Structures are given as C-alpha cells and as structure tokens.
Amino acid sequence: MSEKRDPYEGVADVYDQMAADPELQQFYLYWRRLLLQSISERGLKVRTLVDLMCGTGNSTIPWTRRAGWSIVGVDGSAAMLRQARKKSDRVHWSCQDIRKLRLEVRAEAATCHFDALNHVLSPEELQQVFHRVADILHPGGLFLFDISTENWFRWLHEREKLYTIGKNYMMSSNRYDPKSRIAEFRQLWFIPRGRVYEKRLVQVRERPYTTSEIRKMARTSGFRVLTVKQQWVLEGKPVRLAFVLEKKPPRQPKHC
C-alpha cells in the first residue's frame, strides 16, 4: 500500500465498469450470502456495516437495501470514492488508509473483498489492520474478507492478457518473486478520449498470506476464526480463501 499518488486516478470510472462482469457478479452474490448466513447463525442484529477498501462501491451499495442498516464505505483512493459517491448518497463514504482506520461509530459487521488485504505488503501492517478492525467492531461483531493464496500469484507469474471492458482496453502483465513474496501487477489502459486513446498505467503490488498467518493475526487481535472456505479453486489448487472472524467478548475479571 502506498501513501504517495493515487494509482487509480483517471481509471476509476473504467474499474467501475468491470463490475458488470458476470463472474464478478457471482463473487458479490457469494459474499452477500456468506455474510447473511453468518449473521443468521450468530443471531446478530446488524445496525452498522463497514465495507473496507470498497473501491467504487459495488460491494457496498447493495447493502443499503437492508432496512435499518447504516452503511459505511472506506477506501484509500479518492478517485475511487468520487466514482462511488456519484452512484449513492446513502453510504457514509470515508477516504482513509485502513492501517490507520478511525471511525466515529462501532459496527456489528465489517467486510473487505476482492483480495484487497493482499495489498497490505507486510505481516506487521496487516496485523495493524486487524487491530484497527477489531477496534471498530462491537464484541461478537463479524469480519468477513478474502485472501488470494500464493498459488494464485504463482499461476499469474509472467502471464499477459488483453482485456476489453466496454470501449476500453487493458493489457495486464504480472510478476511474482517467491523470495520476497511480492507480486507486481502492471496494467496498461487504453481509454477512448474523442478520436484518440489515452494511455494510463496502473501499477500495484500484493503479497500472499497463509491460513496459519491469518489465524495467528486474528487471535492476536482478539478474533476467533469461525469459517475458512475455499472460495476459488484453479487447476485443483485453492487460489482464494474466504474467512469469517468473530470479535471475542472482553474477558471477565476473576472474582476471588
């Protein structure tokens, strides 16, 4: 995660168009079902839901249809949130780095989708994120997120692909270093502006995390792991895992 320039400036509207992809729509549906199932199983009454690293809000806005729910969308990209605000004024949008997450409200549920947590490049910083999320949740609150595994980054290594998104084109190239465990994604966008195409380069880095690493971070931050699911399997190997965590209640003092 970088605190320098916004890598999505100039392409946020195109990223928003990608949400129309049928495969992505299936992911959104999967996450909604998993969270609602988890809420039902725990008998949780949700008043506030926080969607972290929400991008242009495609995973956030559908929750505004839930009666009695207050929805908060958090992202570090001002460009992404400008696009999100155009689509809904029923979400409380907040531009901030989730490593330093601060909210005035506490929530019963928090979500973070599309391997967004893989953008946090060190275990120390990801542990910090877990602490911050625990701080904004009520005891018994749920944290649902997904993580891409190393299998995914190894599979993507040195693969290139040309995508067509509406009238836009994007050439994607990927590199993964197993020693540093850092993946580099380079996206060259060609966006029509009148009679010409404007080129935009987006470069982001990600890092895989193991199930054992996530479990340890969860425990350290006061969570218990309720569910780990293989959300996506490629060539017989899990490439994306879905986690459901529950914030533990505070320990009661022992009476003599």
Name these PLM-found stretches.
Residues 127-139:
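A short glycine-rich, Lys/Arg-flanked "PGG" loop and its adjoining helix->strand segment in the class I
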Residues 50, 57-100:
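Class I SAM-dependent methyltransferase SAM/SAH-binding core
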Residues 113-115:
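Residues lining the SAM
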Residues 1-44:
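Conserved class I S-adenosyl-L-methionine
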Residues 211-256:
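C-terminal lobe and adjacent flexible extensions of AdoMet/dcAdoMet transferase-like proteins
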Residues 118-120:
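A short His-aromatic
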Residues 144-216:
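SAM-dependent methyltransferase
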Residues 102-109:
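A short acidic, Gly/Pro-enriched loop at the edge of an enzyme's catalytic core
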